[in-house]
């Protein structure tokens, strides 16, 4: 492993009975970046996080995290990472301040009181710091849990769906914290259900499907693999079929109809499609137009196009 990568895995495999959760996971996360790990339910995202944080042992393959071998140097890996999972590790009988100070003592943090005060302020928890955590809302507990994972300033932070269930204000606060971490040199590996979250935070995305990394790249690079969403509205339902034929021929996509609006839409398989090209093609074919639009692809479109578990992805994206 070179100093370029904070996380590097090659051929990671994990089986649970007859289920192959990971089938050769190759992942490279550059230092000081946010890597978003996306994929449909059951793709292997959480299993990958559990392996890379030493909570599970791989059946095959190798990995290095923060410069240490995942298996041979598991204790050293644990000393360099922070983890926030889908379930919080907060003690409800302790106050928020006491929880963070406890984590500070467990990790032998110098000056835990000062670091605790800093994190309480950073996560907007100062006013509630001396209340029992059992009185906190779900969003406050999630923020406190994330603060606990940062108590020792980890080199690599693993966030497994950290904003699930948070209100928009709390989610934005967490996003600001994540951006600040990378500015300080921390590497973040993030799994999330929220495609907007990955789009806004991730420098690179690893799209996991059926236990493997199917595609990698920046959000912009992945979107470039998927064409834009084109829609045409015509004045008469009688020409919908003609409009659909033009879209089919031009884009290679499968047209869908909204007959109440006399509209036909398609996700283009051609990333070079432009609105002027679309309008000219319809005009050449003699198809009258009321309106035509071309929307840039989103990560939702990337999900639907680039993963094999299409039905699951549609359910997740809904």
Give short role names for the model-derived ranges.
Residues 175-269:
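ABC transporter nucleotide-binding domain
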Residues 82, 99, 108, 145, ...:
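A generic structural signal for secondary-structure junctions
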Residues 4-9, 14-209, 214-215:
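ABC transporter nucleotide-binding domains
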Residues 271-318:
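C-terminal coupling/interaction segments
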Residues 1-13, 309-318:
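ABC-family P-loop ATPase nucleotide-binding domain
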Residues 10, 233, 258, 293-295:
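Solvent-exposed beta-strand sheet faces enriched in polar/charged residues
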Residues 14, 27, 232-234, 266, ...:
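Preference for bulky hydrophobic residues occupying beta-strand positions
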